[in-house]
């Protein structure tokens, strides 16, 4: 039954590095009985450069910090008004592979936007979720000891202009879009609530347990 319970952590607005180090700590110290968790958070403005990232894709960061991190993928931007969700899952226990997890994450975003009349889709060759060739959600995962961390960023109601300072996910000229402009969820809380439901349903979790803040 353990694998059928998902713990949701509502972290509010938290510094990127604090949450990143907490994810690493949780993943490094978990065992076969540790619960799966989904962390929901907003970050202050920051560019994060994944392991495949190339310096030339960071065009003009200006006063926004750039952090080199241990996830897959290239450079992306996080900022207020964006829902960031980190699934900390034992994928061995769930009996799914990395590609399946990526597909489930993308599909959970597609499914949550559908009731708003937003026709979103994933692309086989470019992880993330798109609407009319514009990117609404970015993805970057890390698997360690059969467990996932890092995750997804969904643009909800934010200033998307900092994306113009980079080649998002390594694609020059890739246009970003956000939920509010599409008629989707207007707030990070609303988006988090809807995403939690579609994500947990797709992965077969039967019970959700909610927590405020990081574990002590």
UniProtKB/Swiss-Prot annotation:
One annotated Gene Ontology cellular component of this protein = cytoplasm
- Remarks, miscellaneous: In the reaction, the free carboxyl group of octanoic acid is attached via an amide linkage to the epsilon-amino group of a specific lysine residue of lipoyl domains of lipoate-dependent enzymes.
Q: Which GO terms describe its molecular function?
A: lipoyl(octanoyl) transferase activity
* Gene3D superfamilies, per the entry: Bira Bifunctional Protein, Domain 2
Q: Which domain of life is it from?
A: Bacteria
Location in the cell: Cytoplasm
Question: Can you give the residue ranges of the BPL/LPL catalytic domain?
Answer: 32-207
GO terms (BP aspect): protein modification process
Say which family it is in. Belongs to the LipB family.
Statement: the UniProt record of this protein carries the keyword Nucleus: no
Tell me where the signal peptide lies.
Answer: none
Keywords from UniProt, A to Z, are: Acyltransferase, Cytoplasm, Transferase
Chain positions of site Lowers pKa of active site Cys:
135
> Which reaction equation describes what this protein catalyses?
octanoyl-[ACP] + L-lysyl-[protein] = N(6)-octanoyl-L-lysyl-[protein] + holo-[ACP] + H(+)
Tell me the active site: 169
Q: Which positions does UniProt annotate for substrate binding?
A: 71-78, 138-140, 151-153
Outline what the protein does: Catalyzes the transfer of endogenously produced octanoic acid from octanoyl-acyl-carrier-protein onto the lipoyl domains of lipoate-dependent enzymes. Lipoyl-ACP can also act as a substrate although octanoyl-ACP is likely to be the physiological substrate.
Q: Which InterPro entries match?
A: aa-tRNA-synth_II/BPL/LPL, BPL_LPL_catalytic, Octanoyltransferase, Octanoyltransferase_CS
List the pathway annotation. Answer: Protein modification; protein lipoylation via endogenous pathway; protein N(6)-(lipoyl)lysine from octanoyl-[acyl-carrier-protein]: step 1/2
Organism field: Shewanella amazonensis (strain ATCC BAA-1098 / SB2B)
Q: What is its EC number?
A: 2.3.1.181
- The identity of this protein, by name, is Octanoyltransferase
Check the record and name the NCBIfam families matching this protein: lipB, PRK14342.1
């Amino acid at each position: 039954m353990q694998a059928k319970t998902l713990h949701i952590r509502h972290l509010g607005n938290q510094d990127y590095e604090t949450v990143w180090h907490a994810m690493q700590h949780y993943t490094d110290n978990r065992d076969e009985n540790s619960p799966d968790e989904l962390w929901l958070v907003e970050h202050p403005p920051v560019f994060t450069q994944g392991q495949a990232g190339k310096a030339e894709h960071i065009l003009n960061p200006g006063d926004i910090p750039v952090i080199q991190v241990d996830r897959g993928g290239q450079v992306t931007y996080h900022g207020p008004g964006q829902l960031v969700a980190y699934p900390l899952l034992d994928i061995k226990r769930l009996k799914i592979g990395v590609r399946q997890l990526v597909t489930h994450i993308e599909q959970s975003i597609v499914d949550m936007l559908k009731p708003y009349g937003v026709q979103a889709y994933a692309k086989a060759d470019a992880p993330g979720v798109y609407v009319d060739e514009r990117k609404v959600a970015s993805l970057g995962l890390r698997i360690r000891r059969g467990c996932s961390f890092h995750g997804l960023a969904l643009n909800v109601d934010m200033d998307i202009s900092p994306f113009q300072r980079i080649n998002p996910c390594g694609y020059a000229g890739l246009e970003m879009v956000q939920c509010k402009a599409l008629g989707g969820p207007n707030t990070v809380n609303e988006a988090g609530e809807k995403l939690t439901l579609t994500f947990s349903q797709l992965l077969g979790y039967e019970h959700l347990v909610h927590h405020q803040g990081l574990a002590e």
